[in-house]
């Protein structure tokens, strides 16, 4: 099953997440189909905390992809800010 979820990157104690479309059987940071955004939970100042390609996310959901709980919350946050 195709899912849209977060893949953790960044350094120890400084997480940075890529929002990726992947097969649910792949490892958390493993192979992915497409990168559709990023989330920086510790962004400060002028740093961009969240960027999502909502058109591509809607495309994948239309193809049957499921959303993780956190990604679903981030999409709602992005739509509210837009």
Curated annotation (Swiss-Prot):
The keyword Aminoacyl-tRNA synthetase does not apply. It comes from the Bacteria. Keywords: Ribonucleoprotein, Ribosomal protein. One of its GO terms (molecular function) is structural constituent of ribosome. Transmembrane segments: none annotated. The keyword Ribosomal protein applies. NCBIfam families: S16 (TIGR00002). GO terms for biological process: translation. GO terms for cellular component: cytoplasm; small ribosomal subunit. Coiled coil: none annotated. This is Small ribosomal subunit protein bS16. Belongs to the bacterial ribosomal protein bS16 family.
